[in-house]
Curated annotation (Swiss-Prot):
UniProt-listed InterPro entries: Acyl_CoA_acyltransferase, Leu/Phe-tRNA_Trfase, Leu/Phe-tRNA_Trfase_C, Leu/Phe-tRNA_Trfase_N
Gene from which the chain derives: aat
Catalytic activity reported: N-terminal L-lysyl-[protein] + L-leucyl-tRNA(Leu) = N-terminal L-leucyl-L-lysyl-[protein] + tRNA(Leu) + H(+); N-terminal L-arginyl-[protein] + L-leucyl-tRNA(Leu) = N-terminal L-leucyl-L-arginyl-[protein] + tRNA(Leu) + H(+); L-phenylalanyl-tRNA(Phe) + an N-terminal L-alpha-aminoacyl-[protein] = an N-terminal L-phenylalanyl-L-alpha-aminoacyl-[protein] + tRNA(Phe)
Any one of the GO BP annotations: protein catabolic process
Organism of this sequence: Psychrobacter arcticus (strain DSM 17307 / VKM B-2377 / 273-4)
Family from the record: Belongs to the L/F-transferase family.
Protein name: Leucyl/phenylalanyl-tRNA--protein transferase
Chief place where the protein resides: cytoplasm
Amino acid sequence: MNNINDSSAIHITPETFVKQIRSLGRYNFPEPALVDPDGIGIVGIGGNLAPETLISAYAQGLFPWFNDDEPIAWWCPEPRCVMQPTDYQPSKSLRKQANNARWQLTLNQAFNEVIHACSLPRSNGLPEGEHTWIHDDMIEAYNELHAQGFAHSVEVWDDQGQLVGGLYGLKIGSIYFGESMFHIASNASKLAFWGLMRLCTQSNVTLVDCQLPNEHLMSLGAITLSRTEFLTQLDTLISNGSDAWHKNSHRPLAVSLLGNLQPWQLNP
C-alpha cells in the first residue's frame, strides 16, 4: 500500500481552481492503475483531510473512505458508477408524490445539518450510538470545503418547515461528486436527488460521480465506466466551467415543480 507523500500547500478557490490545477494539494497521490492493477479500489493510505488535500484527491479521481479508528484510506473504484443528469428517470410513484407534495427544496441552506444527519445510523445493523464512516473529522473537513465554496447540500423541507431529507457532495468544474444522502420521511432523499439532477442539468454539470454502483442507482439511470475512462473524462470535466452555487444563488423550489420544465430559479 502506498503512503501519500507531502508537498507544498496552496490555497484553492472555485474561481482559481483551473489555473492551479497542475499544482494542487499537499500530497502527491499515486497513479491508481499502477498501485491497484487488480481493481480492488484502495490506492493510498495516509495524509490528512485539509481542504487542499481533499480537492487534490477529488481532482485525481480519489475520495476518502475509512472508519474513525483507522488511518485515512483513499479510494478509486473499478468500475466507477456515474450518472449523466440528463439521463435521470424518476419513477412514476416518485412523480406522483412530488406532484402532491407541499414540500420545498433548497440549496446550501443547512449543510451542517445535512452532513450530521447523513452520519447517523441507518437500518444497516450499526449498534446504537455508532455512526457511519462520516465521523467528526470528516464532518469538520467537509464543512470547511462548504465554507470555501466546493461542498454543497440539497435540502428537503416538509410543509411544517422540518428538514426531512437531503444530500451533499462536491462540485468541481462540470462534475459533481456525490457523497451521501439521508431521509426521515418517505422518498425525501430521492426527491433531493431529483432536485440535484435538475440543478446539474441547468448549471452545465454534465456528470455526477456516484462512486460505487448499486441496484437503486442503476435503476435511476446510472451507468458504470472503467476507471481509465472515468479518469480520462475527469481531466476535461474539472477544467470546464459551470454556474456558481452558493447559499444565496438559488431560490427555494417547490417539490411539485420538479416534473415541470421550469428551471430552479436564481435569486436576482
